[in-house]
Swiss-Prot record:
Source organism per UniProt: Symbiobacterium thermophilum (strain DSM 24528 / JCM 14929 / IAM 14863 / T)
Pfam families: Ribosomal_L18p (PF00861)
PANTHER family in UniProt: 39S RIBOSOMAL PROTEIN L18, MITOCHONDRIAL, LARGE RIBOSOMAL SUBUNIT PROTEIN UL18M
Protein name per UniProt: Large ribosomal subunit protein uL18
Sorted UniProt keywords: Ribonucleoprotein, Ribosomal protein, RNA-binding, rRNA-binding
Amino acid sequence: MIKKLDRNKARRKRQLRVRKTVHGTPERPRLNVFRSNQNIYAQIIDDTVGRTLVSASTLDPEVRSRLQGSGGNKAAAAIVGEVVAKRALAAGVTKVVFDRAGYLYHGRVAALAEAAREAGLEF
């Protein structure tokens, strides 16, 4: 019997519980965050049609050129937040619903959110 806590399984349960109430609409799409050890990804999603409007990650050339070191730190997350906000504003999206996907609002997730707010997204 496995007694050690599977962190990703627990995160997934939190994510599914929150996703019952958090939905993106055309007026306020959902800003979703995915965090891996080496990278961070952000998508703005309209859940009514199931379509990603804009996205950014540490793998994008625009972000990668501004990175110094790893893509798995708070500085990289802040750059991704700024880039996704600029792309969203260019696509006509100003207000979003933040979906932290079961991650704690701390560290890289918080850095991405704060940078997106400073760049002009409202949530």
